[in-house]
Each structure stands twice: as C-alpha cells, then as structure tokens.
C-alpha cells in the first residue's frame, strides 16, 4: 500500500498525459497551477498522493490506451482523477473503474484542482510555491506548444472533437503574445502554434483588437503570425485549414518571419470522399494554390494527414488520391486507416471498406509517399540548412531543419568538430539523404 507524503510535507502528484499537443498544453496548465500551490510531481504512481490521467477520446484505440492508463493508476495507487477528452463522455470510464475520484472533460482546470484539493489538500510552503513565469512545460526547454484557441466550428463527419471540446473559443491576441514572449525570454527557440483550426483563429470574437505594447493587435491569423515573428524565435504553424486567407502568411515565410512550413490536414483529395467527410472539396484549386505558394516561397514544406478506407472510398477515389499526391508533392505525411468513432456521423455512411482493403491502401499510399519524400529530400543534398539540435550523442547529434516539426517529422543527423548543446541552432552542410532523414556536418554556428 502506498504511503503518500509525510504530514506537513508537500503533497505529491503523479501525472499521465495522453493524446495530442493540445492535450499536452492542458496538462502543462494543470501542473503549473498545482506547482504554484506547492504540490510536487512524483516519478511513480505508488509514491504519489493522487494520480491525474489526462485522457484522449478521439479514436477507439486512444480510448483503450486511456482506459489502460487509468487501470494502471488504480492498481498502483488507487486515488485517481480523470480528465481530458474521454472524460467528456464518462460512461465507459465509470463502468470500467467506478472507484475513480473524479471525471471531467477537457479544459476543466478548476474541477481538476478541486478534486485534487479534496483528495490531498495543499500544504503552503513559500520555498516550493514558486513557478517560472512561462509556467511548467513538459517539452524540452528549447521548444514549446503555443495554443491559441480551443474547440472547433467545423463538423467533419468522422470527428467528434466539437462534441468533446466545444466550438471555437479564441484567446485575445495580446494574451497569446504575452505567453509567447515569456517563453522566448525563458530560452524557448521554437514556438509551435496549435489549435483545432489555427486558420480560423479570431472568427468567434470577430477578430477583436487587444492592446499589445504600444499598439493594438487583431485576433487574426495573419496579424498574430506577424507579431509572433517579431519575437526572435522559430514560429511553426500547425493545424491550418486551406482557407483562401492562408495565402497571406506565405509572404511572412518569404521574409523569414515565420518558418516556411504549413501543417494542413487535407485528409483526402477525391471530391466524392471529401464531400462525405464534410471537408472543403475544391482540391483542384488547392493544387493551384500549392504551386503558387511554392512559387513565392520555394523552401516551403507541407505536412498533412490523410485517411484511407473512408466509407464509400472506391478504387477510383484512391487512385485519384495517389495522383493528387504525386502532383502536390507533400513533404511530410501521416496516414490513418479509417476506424469508426462512437458518436461520429460517418458511422452510418454506406460502403464500409473491408479492413484488408484499408491495409492495402495504407501500404500503397505510404510507399508512394516514401518515394516523394526521398525525391524532395535528395534536392537538399549539397545545400546549407539551419538546424535546431534536439539530442546530443557521443558522436552524432540529432536535430531538425525548418521543414521538420518535433516528434512527427524527419530528423537531421550531424557530426561536429565541437560539442553541441540541445536547443542550439547551427548551420549544416547536407551530405546525404534517405527516405525521411538528412545527414550532414556542422559548417557554422
């Protein structure tokens, strides 16, 4: 039986964070609040006074991972607080683990704190109740996720995020910029801008202005990106929908204000499938825009995600997607095999695709993308690239170019004549490329 903390000592919290970067930011905010109240983080469940599990509920596989994490926490500790997307529909958790102390949905920070207080009241200690101005971060010190809004106004047929996280709620621009400035002052070299729909930022608050330094800044995608680009850090834009006004940020990339990188979840290319998904269907125009973007900014890297085996997807639809990829030349790609999600309207669509066909299409798409990636990376051999160092090994350092986001994209492996540090940005000569990664030598600091 775990003992927890000694009387009058700081209570200890064990934390499990699952799911996407948006959920990670939620975890960081909860931990920051708890540290400000004097709670300490425990390395193991059995050394904690209470365990918090921040769940993911987007796919059934993610729900199973969340349930397994709750089960482990119950077995090792017994005092468990559940929050996050799966907590928005608590029935499955209540049935599996009726003994959990509390279940709340995403962004319910006050409810989580109240549950922690009931399970293990805070003990004030002026030497412990100190939190850095940028808050507690769960990422390496040199990069951080910057969440600019919550929720989503889109109603894609395969997605239940609006049910779990609600409609779009944008933060005031000045609030975002103050957080970004604190992060950069604390040594963050790369800001990863995230939300459910980054390009819709400010729509819900009618692009309201807020005071920032000696001026007012509108809560608008372009305006926010421009101001973030003045802070001196790499700025990487994630979860951008291909709305026409996205064209406006390409100029900031050309000018070096934000990274030449767009993460756009196209999901498919066939008009028939996109219509069934309730996604923008003018992908012929999207190809023209991609060409225009790259014409203005040749270094632009595009990342995207796609779903194969969506209900009603025919062989012709899939062939259309492969042809579209050949023309679009997406640099970085993630692919998912469609799976039903409880509550999604796509579950009722006709033409469910057999699992073996989903697997065949996934294999074919990834093989095609591997060739595209290898071809695009080969063009970088002989060039000089700025690289941010993530890890330093005995002989080789691992970093990322401006075309690579952490954890989801490729890497650059470098040799150097002098020791390197994580977070350092160096100039490297690229000497070799494989399907997904680059290899080179540090040529400047």
UniProtKB/Swiss-Prot annotation:
Residues 11-121 form the MTTase N-terminal domain. Residues 378-444 form the TRAM domain. Residues 138-375 form the Radical SAM core domain. Its cofactor is [4Fe-4S] cluster. One of its GO terms (cellular component) is cytosol. Its main location: cytoplasm. It is found in: Cytoplasm. Gene3D superfamilies: Methylthiotransferase, N-terminal domain, Nucleic acid-binding proteins, tm_1862 like domain. The keyword Acyltransferase does not apply. It comes from the Bacteria. SMART domains: Elp3 (SM00729). InterPro entries: Elp3/MiaA/NifB-like_rSAM, Methylthiotransferase, Methylthiotransferase_CS, Methylthiotransferase_N, Methylthiotransferase_N_sf, NA-bd_OB-fold, Ribosomal_uS12_MeSTrfase_RimO, rSAM. GO terms for molecular function: 4 iron, 4 sulfur cluster binding; aspartic acid methylthiotransferase activity; metal ion binding; protein methylthiotransferase activity. Binds 2 [4Fe-4S] clusters. One cluster is coordinated with 3 cysteines and an exchangeable S-adenosyl-L-methionine. [4Fe-4S] cluster 2 binds at residues 152, 156, 159. Keywords: 4Fe-4S, Cytoplasm, Iron, Iron-sulfur, Metal-binding, S-adenosyl-L-methionine, Transferase. Signal peptide: none annotated. SUPFAM superfamilies: Radical SAM enzymes (SSF102114). Belongs to the methylthiotransferase family. RimO subfamily. Catalyzes the methylthiolation of an aspartic acid residue of ribosomal protein uS12. This is Ribosomal protein uS12 methylthiotransferase RimO. It comes from Bradyrhizobium sp. (strain ORS 278).
């Amino acid at each position: 039986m775990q003992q927890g903390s000694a009387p009058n000592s700081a209570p200890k919290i064990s934390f499990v964070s699952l799911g996407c970067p948006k959920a990670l930011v939620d975890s960081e905010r909860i931990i920051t609040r708890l540290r400000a109240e004097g709670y300490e983080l425990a390395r193991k469940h059995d050394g904690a006074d209470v365990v918090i599990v921040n769940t993911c509920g987007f796919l059934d596989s993610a729900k199973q991972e969340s349930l397994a994490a709750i089960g482990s926490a119950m077995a090792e500790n017994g005092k468990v607080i559940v929050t996050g997307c799966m907590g928005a529909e608590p029935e499955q958790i209540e049935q599996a683990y009726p003994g959990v102390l509390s279940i709340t949905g995403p962004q319910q920070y006050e409810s989580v704190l109240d549950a922690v207080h009931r399970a293990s009241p805070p003990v004030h200690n002026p030497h412990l109740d100190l939190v850095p101005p940028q808050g507690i971060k769960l990422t390496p010190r040199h990069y951080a996720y910057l969440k600019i809004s919550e929720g989503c106004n889109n109603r894609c047929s395969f997605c239940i995020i609006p049910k779990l996280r609600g409609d779009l709620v944008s933060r005031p621009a000045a609030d975002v910029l103050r957080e970004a400035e604190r992060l950069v002052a604390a040594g963050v070299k790369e800001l990863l801008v995230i939300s459910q729909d980054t390009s819709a930022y400010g729509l819900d608050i009618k692009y309201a202005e807020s005071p920032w330094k000696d001026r007012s800044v509108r809560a608008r995608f372009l305006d926010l990106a421009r101001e973030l680009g003045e802070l001196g850090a790499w700025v990487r834009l994630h979860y951008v929908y291909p709305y026409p006004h996205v064209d406006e940020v390409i100029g900031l990339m050309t000018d070096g204000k934000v990274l030449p990188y767009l993460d756009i979840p196209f999901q498919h290319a066939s008009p028939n499938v996109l219509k069934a998904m309730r996604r923008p269907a003018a992908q012929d125009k999207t190809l023209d825009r991609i060409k225009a973007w790259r014409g203005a900014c040749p270094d632009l890297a595009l990342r995207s995600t796609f779903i194969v085996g969506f209900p009603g997807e025919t062989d012709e639809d899939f062939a259309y997607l492969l042809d579209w990829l050949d023309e679009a030349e997406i640099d970085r790609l993630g692919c998912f095999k469609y799976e039903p999600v409880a509550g999604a309207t796509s579950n009722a669509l006709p033409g469910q695709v057999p699992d073996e066909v989903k697997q065949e299409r996934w294999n074919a798409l990834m093989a095609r993308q591997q060739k595209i990636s290898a071809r695009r990376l080969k063009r970088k051999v002989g060039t000089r690239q700025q690289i941010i160092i993530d890890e330093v090994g005995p002989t080789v350092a691992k970093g990322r170019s401006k075309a690579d986001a952490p954890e989801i994209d490729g890497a650059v492996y470098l040799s150097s004549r002098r020791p390197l540090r994580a977070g350092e940005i160096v100039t490297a000569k690229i000497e070799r490329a494989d399907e997904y990664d680059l290899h080179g030598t540090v040529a400047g600091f």
